[in-house]
Amino acid sequence: MEMPNLGDMMKQIQQAGAKMQDVQKQLEKTVTHGEAGGGMVKVSVNGRQRLLSLAIDPDIMDDREMVQDLVLAAVNSAIEESGRVSQEEIAKVAGGMINPADILKNMGK
């Protein structure tokens, strides 16, 4: 059985690292959206799960509890979609070498 070439393995690891940096830059530009209450609350989140925008219909501002619930629902929806998109992009680059969930845990650090 032939041993893998350590130099080739190191080169592959370096290439994968460079690709991952490119993916993270791309994810910062990728925007997903979430909404709640039939569009009364809308949010945008980037692929690194940073909240970019929040829009609240002025007609619902008098009901503070409802606004809070809708904001939470919209943000969670956008973050879930962002996480799905991020995992897909990371999986394309990782090709089974790296667990995307482990990378996502460290993205916010």
From Swiss-Prot:
<protein>
    <recommendedName>
        <fullName>Nucleoid-associated protein Cvib_1034</fullName>
    </recommendedName>
</protein>
<dbReference type="InterPro" id="IPR036894">
    <property type="entry name" value="YbaB-like_sf"/>
</dbReference>
<comment type="similarity">
    <text>Belongs to the YbaB/EbfC family.</text>
</comment>
<dbReference type="GO" id="GO:0003677">
    <property type="term" value="F:DNA binding"/>
</dbReference>
<keyword id="KW-0963">Cytoplasm</keyword>
<dbReference type="Pfam" id="PF02575">
    <property type="entry name" value="YbaB_DNA_bd"/>
</dbReference>
<dbReference type="InterPro" id="IPR004401">
    <property type="entry name" value="YbaB/EbfC"/>
</dbReference>
<keyword id="KW-0238">DNA-binding</keyword>
<comment type="function">
    <text>Binds to DNA and alters its conformation. May be involved in regulation of gene expression, nucleoid organization and DNA protection.</text>
</comment>
<comment type="subunit">
    <text>Homodimer.</text>
</comment>
<dbReference type="GO" id="GO:0043590">
    <property type="term" value="C:bacterial nucleoid"/>
</dbReference>
<dbReference type="GO" id="GO:0005829">
    <property type="term" value="C:cytosol"/>
</dbReference>
